[in-house]
Amino acid sequence: MNTLKVVAPTKSHRSGNRLKGLGIAVSIAIAAIAIYALTHTLKSIDTNEVFEVIRHTNVSLIALAATLVITSYVSLTFYDLLALRTIGRTDIPYRIAALASFTSYPIAHGVGAVSLISPVIRYRIYSHNGLSAFDVANICFLTGLTFWLGNLTALGIGLFFAPDAISMVDFLSAKVNQWLAVALLLGVAGFLSWCWFPRNIGTKRWPVRLPSGPLVLLQIVIGVFDLGAAALAMYVLIPAGPNIGIFPIMAVFIAATLLGFASHTPAGIGVFDATFLIGLGNGDKEPLVAALLMFRLMYHFLPFIFALSLFGVVEGWRSLGRRRDS
């Protein structure tokens, strides 16, 4: 007679479920607070003035911002290229890394489920070039590492040189923010020192090779360059009136990016915008709202549409090829 054996959940399984539940709760809380703050902030906005600011924005500044956005997305492609070199897949050409990067990032961030969508898109592209699911998991981990190293370094720099900028967001004094900046930069430097000689993490069955020190340094440079280009795009779109420096914009921009990422809302919508307006909106907010609208069009909406179309064309072409072969 067969009996059904009931296996009790392990302690690690229960703690994992608790952490997952806590993460969901934090994401919902961030999104709810941000949407409330954004709604409250936008009540006093004169929409006619916002569109007037957009209409009077110099075409050359829009072109410069677009160039900086393109530069940011080009630098993103090196996230994947570095990850491929780290796992020893030097045979994968740059064009494949660029395709995987450019399709996965805008689509995943546009949908909001980055940790779910990005690996699926990367696998669809890399599996046709001989990479396994484990290889793709390694690439996702390493590109995420580049993202966090770049963000934390740039945030540390921005906080150190403009500690007051983020005080409206984290409610900490300028002095505390400067110490936080030092802690962030020391943490990144410590990780760089720890990785200077090749290391593996994970298990014997599933080892994950960390990049060596020089590659980690390159990851940091690429990550900061990517974020710096994006922050500069926002900077040039803000009219001269608010008189906001590049370091405050960098600090608030990265804080807004990280909070938007943590909220899992599509393109950080609501969260990114509220953080940006609260962090920089001491005066008239109409110029900032105008800059936000133009930036979102350039950095989020158009790349999302283009990446979605490109991925659809690639998948359609491959499907057509399979039909011909059969």
Question: For the regions a protein language model found, what residue spans apply to each?
Answer:
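Mid-bilayer segments of alpha-helical transmembrane spans in multi-pass integral membrane proteins
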Residues: Y105-V114, G144-G156
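Hydrophobic alpha-helical membrane segments of integral membrane proteins
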Residues: I125, A137-C140, L145, L152-G156, ...
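Transmembrane helix boundary and interhelical junction motifs in multipass membrane proteins
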Residues: V74-D80, G112-R122, A229, F247, ...
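Predominantly cytoplasmic-facing regulatory/coupling regions of multi-pass membrane proteins
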Residues: M1-F102, N151, F160-F261, G283-S326
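Helix-loop junctions at the membrane interface of multi-pass solute transporters
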Residues: R85-I87, Y123-G130, G279-G281
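Generic hydrophobic, aliphatic-rich segments that mediate packing or membrane embedding
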Residues: V50, Y79-A83, A98-T103, S118-R122, ...
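Membrane-interface alpha-helices at helix entry/exit sites of multi-pass transporters
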Residues: R95-L99, V114-I117, H128-G144, D284-F295
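Hydrophobic alpha-helical transmembrane segments of multi-pass membrane transport proteins
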Residues: Y94-H128, G260-S263
